[in-house]
């Protein structure tokens, strides 16, 4: 397990990285800034494992892994996991937590484009959760993910739809009213409509397999997957 450094390429937003660097030490605080990620992780993991036909014995790449919440959980399922992120502090937190947990994850600090140039076609599963809305060129990330997965392999994306409801729910509600995430975490202008994401996907070797919404109920304080992609959504694609 390591946390290598590498040169930065064009597709990096240093202000976005700084946001997560500032709160990296709280990544594994179940009641802290990343509480929502811990809450939705079982749903994400279950969706990925089910759609990919299980994770045991598979080689998996988690793009934009942050502090390693999803990466660790996939490793616990028996996958060989590499976590990729451009934030140095989140990767250090991820590396330390994996050591404390006895979980083997290989953490690398480089962009997905750089990784794709060296490791094309090497992964059974690639995940890219809540990362596309934090980079200048999300289409470039989609292309790189397509290059990294093996023929017949699975690629999963999750992001936020761009509309009035998602602004109210993800920005006004989550950041300012419920204070579920730090203020300034999201910029609605960077949210991605499903049609836009699918438009990028069809320009690669990937094919859409399934899409689902991720829904939060503030009354019951619960999350669930289901129809409706007007706020958070997940997309399963497969390499042709």
UniProtKB/Swiss-Prot annotation:
State its Enzyme Commission number(s). Answer: 2.1.1.222, 2.1.1.64
InterPro entries per record = SAM-dependent_MTases_sf (IPR029063), UbiG_MeTrfase (IPR010233)
Q: Does the keyword Methyltransferase apply?
A: yes
Query: What's the short name of a Pfam family annotated to this entry?
Result: Methyltransf_23
Query: Family per UniProt?
Result: Belongs to the methyltransferase superfamily. UbiG/COQ3 family.
Family matches, as HAMAP family: UbiG
This chain's protein is named: Ubiquinone biosynthesis O-methyltransferase
Q: Which gene encodes it?
A: ubiG
- SUPFAM superfamilies for this protein: S-adenosyl-L-methionine-dependent methyltransferases
Provide the residue positions that the database annotates as binding S-adenosyl-L-methionine.
44, 64, 85, 129
Entry annotated with the keyword Methyltransferase: yes
Q: Which cysteines are joined by disulfide bonds?
A: none
Which Gene Ontology BP terms does the record give? methylation
PANTHER family linked to this entry = METHYLTRANSFERASE, UBIQUINONE BIOSYNTHESIS O-METHYLTRANSFERASE, MITOCHONDRIAL
């Amino acid at each position: 397990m390591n946390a290598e450094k590498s040169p930065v390429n064009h597709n990096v937003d240093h202000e976005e990285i700084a946001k997560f660097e500032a709160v990296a030490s709280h990544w594994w605080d179940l009641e802290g800034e990343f509480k929502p990620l811990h809450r939705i992780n079982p749903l994400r993991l279950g969706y990925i494992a089910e759609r990919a036909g299980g994770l045991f014995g598979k080689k998996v790449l988690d793009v934009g892994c942050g502090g390693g919440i999803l990466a660790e959980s996939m490793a616990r399922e028996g996958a060989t996991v590499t976590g990729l992120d451009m934030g140095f502090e989140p990767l250090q937190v991820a590396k330390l937590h994996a050591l404390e947990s006895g979980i083997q994850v290989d953490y690398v600090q480089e962009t997905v484009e750089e990784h794709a140039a060296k490791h094309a076609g090497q992964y059974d599963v690639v995940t890219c959760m809540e990362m596309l809305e934090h980079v200048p060129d999300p289409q470039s990330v989609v292309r790189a993910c397509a290059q990294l997965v093996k023929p017949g392999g699975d690629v999963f994306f999750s992001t936020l739809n761009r509309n009035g409801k998602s602004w109210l729910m993800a920005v006004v509600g989550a950041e300012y009213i419920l204070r579920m995430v730090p203020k300034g975490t999201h910029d609605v202008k960077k949210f991605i409509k499903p049609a836009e994401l699918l438009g990028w996907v069809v320009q690669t070797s990937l094919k859409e397999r399934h899409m689902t919404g991720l829904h939060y109920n503030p009354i019951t304080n619960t999350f669930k997957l289901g129809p409706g992609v007007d706020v958070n959504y997940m997309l399963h694609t497969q390499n042709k």
